[in-house]
From Swiss-Prot:
Keywords: Cytoplasm, Methyltransferase, S-adenosyl-L-methionine, Transferase, tRNA processing. It catalyses: guanosine(37) in tRNA + S-adenosyl-L-methionine = N(1)-methylguanosine(37) in tRNA + S-adenosyl-L-homocysteine + H(+). The keyword tRNA processing applies. Belongs to the RNA methyltransferase TrmD family. Homodimer. The gene is trmD. Specifically methylates guanosine-37 in various tRNAs. GO terms for biological process: tRNA N1-guanine methylation. This is tRNA (guanine-N(1)-)-methyltransferase. CDD domains: TrmD-like.
Amino acid sequence: MWIGVISLFPEMFRAITDYGVTGRAVKNGLLNVQCWSPRDFTHDRHRTVDDRPYGGGPGMLMMVQPLQDAIHEAKNKAGEGTKVIYLSPQGRKLDQQGVSELAANPKMILVCGRYEGIDERLIATEIDEEWSMGDYVLSGGELAAMALIDSVSRFIPGVLGHEASSAEDSFARGLLDCPHYTRPEVLAGMEVPSVLLSGNHAEIRRWRLKQSLGRTWLRRPELLESLALTDEQATLLNEFQREYRVRQHDD
């Protein structure tokens, strides 16, 4: 997968290219992240990249010419048909379904805004899609872009150490993940659930699915509203709910 990034702070993306899962993906040639800074496309000695908004008001906007030239340079590098994405609080909210859709693109260009944003005409002429990390404001698009890169890279074959890992992530099936445990068997007086020590893979699978359903019901019940549960899932969720209510009553 090739990802181009337009950012005033390209050095921030070393967190993606040099570390962790994405860093290994870059090292192994599975992920290529290339950055362009609008500052490199300025023509004044101050390398100006911001400009006043028409109509006045607080704050500045990213200057059109350097940003547009950087986008064009990235497009020329990427080739025809490459999707250009602007990270914006006004965009479609990113969820696992959206990540899966974006991961189907072998190439994409991410535009990271700064200041009060970018000229609306640039959005109309240069941007294909706008995506948001959520209903809150960041100082710039870089952190959002890094989160997007990290999430889509998990879908690249060979990036994860275990191919089943991405399929078992939270939200991969529309559900939150189940609880996980490692050594020691007893921690702060709490024991690892005995089923996980049993070696019975069918029961372990059933327990994990039940816990995943139950955790989603407790913490993100709205996710269940959009799911068509199988008979097994419905049965396990009912079991979890009954057991949970008994525990609450006993407490």
